Amino acid sequence: MAEQSFMIDWSRVPDFFTRWNKRFDVDAMNGTVGNFEVVYSSYAPDNIYDCLSGDVLSNDVQITQTVDCGLVWDEQGTISISDDVIWTIGDEIIPLKAVFIRNKVNGYVMGYSINQTSFDITNQVILDADTVLWSIHTGGYV
């Protein structure tokens, strides 16, 4: 089966996604430093553990696309993905079934959502584009 290209219908995405393409660095629990990427999939199993091998995406995850990204989060440490984010192939609309946040260096999954619209990334530390260190675990600047 030929690989199909997917694209976001950006007209359906809220204004806060204007920060989408800014890069953020993460100091992962194992000490490696790398960029986040978002992994989109139009397939989602019933159980998250079917997607993961340890904390790494398993080979049977049908990856639609990966995108280098910045993240939008609130003070509770939740990263929001809009319900209106959709994928299209021509005129066909394909709903997102699974989204993962992954460390590009080691492949570890930092957060995920299956048939939902948010990620819990408690205990991760994010460095934003203005070099402000934000600790989601403590809920404040550090």
Summary of predicted features, one role per range:
Residues 1-98, 103-142:
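Small cysteine-rich, disulfide-bonded extracellular modules of the LU/uPAR three-finger superfamily
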